[in-house]
């Protein structure tokens, strides 16, 4: 996957496409994003549907909250170990083949969760699922870098990230329905049917991606020569603003580690919500799996327009940091209100909605930062490294919350820790180095 290519000289070289760049980018977006959003929706669903399985699985298999939290989180150990190698392979082989491989293998392993019968099998399959899915999200971020300039990525990434709340919006009711409808259908239990049914679409999507996704702008038969020149020209114009560096330099760059720390704090809060929301709703007095699924969809439904509006506003203002800081404090308020209203279903849902909408709107803005400062192999390695270090929080968060629940017999201590992490994230975002802020501003200004 290469960046922009050399362009022919002459004033008329990109004149046709240049007359309506918005129309051109809308066309690109409609071609790429619907398929990628659907794929990531199932990635999120297969990652977090264990939260709905918990409503019955822990009783059937006699798991404690600590066992569940460790199993939910161990996914991210496999994910982290395979993340950077996976993204470097994508850089060499191209997005089409590697993303298709990721989809097929994670779909098979997600369906295989139905054979879990002990803590050991739970841990092993969740670990392997993490290995299988590694590289998908940073690979998509890296892929979109080669289609959109920095000034458009806030909206584009916010649109792509709609997959996360969509998985909650659709996955909650669907998971609840499957577990209700298949409750007495042999040869499996309801939660086993849920894993099997929800794993199959990823395999089918892998086949679709293999035959339809274009690796590069120049491979897209649905674009004219003028349109390809226009897209390549916009990418070429910003390349000198980004650091030209190697894979090793991304590992040595202190900006990589600063951004990883920010992402770690954000992801801690995110998976604190995702893996435990069904349990919190259930403990507020809702016992039906279907109703838990329907009510758990409400925060995600609100997150969708929030992400779009915040992403567009951030692009128009060409400003990321203070948008993110405001969202961090909104998320803090959401977690603290969860403590206050944990036994009142509708107020609790309002608090969960604040926390969910805040984290969902923050993440696409975060990913505009590394895509503005790295390029080439350094971008592939830097994005994967930031993502892999950040998502280690996906292991820590569910395990920590489960351990604290077992230790204190209450959800409050875990919620207080998650609220504190939002404050830490806000401070780290505010402390983004001046050099990084200047470089981001230069790229944004260049693409206005």
Please place each PLM-identified region on the residue numbering.
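Glycine-rich segments within core transmembrane alpha-helices of 12-TM secondary carriers
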Residues: 155-179, 201-202, 387-397
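Extracytoplasmic gate region of multi-pass secondary transporters
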Residues: 50-51, 248-311, 363, 367, ...
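Cytoplasmic helix-loop-helix junction between adjacent transmembrane helices
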Residues: 125-162
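C-terminal transmembrane helical hairpin of 12-TM major facilitator-type secondary transporters
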Residues: 320-369
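Conserved MFS/SLC helix-loop-helix module at the cytosolic interface between two early adjacent transmembrane helices
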Residues: 81-120
């Amino acid at each position: 996957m290469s960046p922009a290519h050399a362009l022919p000289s002459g004033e008329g070289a990109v004149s046709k496409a240049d007359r309506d760049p918005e129309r051109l980018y809308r066309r690109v977006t409609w071609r790429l994003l619907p398929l990628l959003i659907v794929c990531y929706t199932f990635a999120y669903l297969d990652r977090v549907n264990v939260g709905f399985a918990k409503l019955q699985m822990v009783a059937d298999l006699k798991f404690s909250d600590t066992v569940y939290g460790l199993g939910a989180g161990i996914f991210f150990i496999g994910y982290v170990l395979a993340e950077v190698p996976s993204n470097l392979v994508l850089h060499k082989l191209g997005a089409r083949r590697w993303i298709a491989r990721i989809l097929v293998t994670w779909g098979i392993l997600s369906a295989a969760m139905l054979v879990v019968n002990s803590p050991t099998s739970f841990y092993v399959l969740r670990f392997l699922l993490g290995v299988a899915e590694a590289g998908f999200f940073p690979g998509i971020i890296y892929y979109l870098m080669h289609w959109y300039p920095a000034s458009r990525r806030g909206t584009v990434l916010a649109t792509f990230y709609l997959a996360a709340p969509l998985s909650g919006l659709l996955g909650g009711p669907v998971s609840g329905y499957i577990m209700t409808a298949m409750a007495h259908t042999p040869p499996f239990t309801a939660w086993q049917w849920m894993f099997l049914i929800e794993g199959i679409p990823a395999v089918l999507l892998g086949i679709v991606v293999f035959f339809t996704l274009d690796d590069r702008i120049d491979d897209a038969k649905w674009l004219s020569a003028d349109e390809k020149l226009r897209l390549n020209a916009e990418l070429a114009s910003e390349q000198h603003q980004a650091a030209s560096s190697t894979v090793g330099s991304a590992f040595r760059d202190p900006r990589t580690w600063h951004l990883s720390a920010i992402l770690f704090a954000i992801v801690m809060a995110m998976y604190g919500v995702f893996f435990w929301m069904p349990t919190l709703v259930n403990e507020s007095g809702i016992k039906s799996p279907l109703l838990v699924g329907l009510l758990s969809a409400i925060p995600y439904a609100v997150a969708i327009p929030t992400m779009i509006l915040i992403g567009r506003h951030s692009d128009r203002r060409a400003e990321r940091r203070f948008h993110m800081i405001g969202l961090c404090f909104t998320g803090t308020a959401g977690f603290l209100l969860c403590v206050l209203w944990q036994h009142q279903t509708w107020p609790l849902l309002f608090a969960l909605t604040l926390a969910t909408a805040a984290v969902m709107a923050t993440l696409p803005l975060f990913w505009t930062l590394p895509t503005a400062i790295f390029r080439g192999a350094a971008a592939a390695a830097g994005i994967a490294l930031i993502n892999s270090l950040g998502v280690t929080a996906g292991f820590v968060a569910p395990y920590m919350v489960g351990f604290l629940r077992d230790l204190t017999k209450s959800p409050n201590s875990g919620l207080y820790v998650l609220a504190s992490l939002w404050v830490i994230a806000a401070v780290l975002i505010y402390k983004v180095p001046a050099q990084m802020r200047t470089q981001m501003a230069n790229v944004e200004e260049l693409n206005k």
